[in-house]
């Protein structure tokens, strides 16, 4: 499953700009809602996300529209349910009819400078420069994204701006499950005694559809965790939380 955690900042240094404030839109990839210390989770520490939550509004009844990256992002930037506009799987191209209606285009037409850095995945990993209303200010990479955004913020802007910072992590937990190297540096292997326990609903659901079990058995790339032991899952959870902390540090920059 994939979730997107989103954080939006409205900032203005001049009273006259209140009607059209500068907007910084930060989102992370595959971060479940409980993976923040401000959500009461004792297994990780996210001071920067906590600070954003404390300074704004923390929604506890919001849902991701799709479990896959591309469809979820498609909904976010078009306002449509993914299956309503043909964005049901990763790799689905954005329909030409929607390109003039995307969030970036609409905000640009409202008089904003719009910039995008990081992961796009609709379907290209990076947003095409000057398309969808955005100037592409940084590639699909967490390394250097914060610095690129800081440089953008330091510029003298003649218009209000809308800046999107799209982080990949904690998506790298997929690489961990597949025993692959992480793109932005590996996480040290923990002692099992330092790993969090398992949730109360850890046991396999006896009512799962047969197709789910079939996918687990026959599609390793989708379900590389099929053979995980309880100890493997505890180490997985430990690593996942360290990846969340890693992206929290990037946001703090």
Give the label of every model feature segment.
Residues 1-8:
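Sec-dependent signal peptide recognition
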Residues 8-16:
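Hydrophobic h-region of N-terminal signal peptides that target proteins for export
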Residues 18, 30-35, 39-41, 155-159, ...:
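Active-site-proximal cap/lid insertion segments
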Residues 18-57, 66, 176:
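Active-site-proximal N-terminal segment of extracellular/periplasmic enzymes that hydrolyze or transfer
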Residues 27-28, 61-63, 162-169:
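Short beta-strand segments
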Residues 54-57, 61-90:
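Active-site nucleophile/metal-coordination loop of metallo-enzymes that catalyze phosphate/sulfate
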Residues 75-187:
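Catalytic-site neighborhoods of secreted/periplasmic enzymes
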